[in-house]
Swiss-Prot record:
The keyword Hydrolase applies. Belongs to the glutaminase PdxT/SNO family. It comes from Haloarcula marismortui (strain ATCC 43049 / DSM 3752 / JCM 8966 / VKM B-1809). This is Pyridoxal 5'-phosphate synthase subunit PdxT. GO terms for molecular function: glutaminase activity; pyridoxal 5'-phosphate synthase (glutamine hydrolysing) activity.
Amino acid sequence: MTLRAGVLAVQGDVSEHGDAIERAAAAHDRTAEVVEIREAGLVPDCDVLLLPGGESTTISRLIHREGIAEEIESHVEAGKPVLATCAGLIVSATDAQDDRVDTLNVIDVSVERNAFGRQRDSFEAPLDVTGLNESFPAVFIRAPVIDYVGEDVEVLATWDDRPVAVRDGPVVGTSFHPELTEDPRIHDLAFFDSVES
C-alpha cells in the first residue's frame, strides 16, 4: 500500500523530508508518494503531513495566504498524522510568542523561537524518546524551546529539562530536525502504529 505523504514546501528545499518519509515507509514494507504542498487542494488527498523547518513567520504567512492552513487544520481534525519539525512546530503551536506568526493551534504548546541559539549554536544530541528503544541523534538548528505544554499533550523527549518532542493527538512536534539523520524512527513514531528500532 502506498502512503501519500504531503510535505509543506512553501519555503526552501524539502528533499530531505521526502527521503526520510520514504525510509520510514520502507521500514514498514510500504512505499511513499511524496507530494510537495505549495498550494491549496493537495492536503485533503494526503494520508500524512510533514510541516518542516524554515522561517516560521514566512511559512505562516504563506500557508494562510494560499489557503493551506485550513486544509492542515481539517487534516488534524480528521485524526490524520502530522509531523511538525522546528518551524513547523512553531506554526503548529497554540502560542508562538510572536504576533507575526498566525499559528494553526493544533499542538497545545507555547514555543519560543530560536531559543536554543542562532545558527552557529547548532548541535546534535542523543535523545531518549518515548517509544524508541535506543537514543535518537537529534539535530538542533536555531531550535525553538517548548516552554508550556497543555495537559493533554504527551512529552516524548526532553533536552536540558525542556520538552523538545511532543504528541498532541495525531500531531507530533519536534524542536529538532529528524530528517537530517539517516534514522527514520521519528517519522515512524509520527506516521505508523508501531516503531521499529
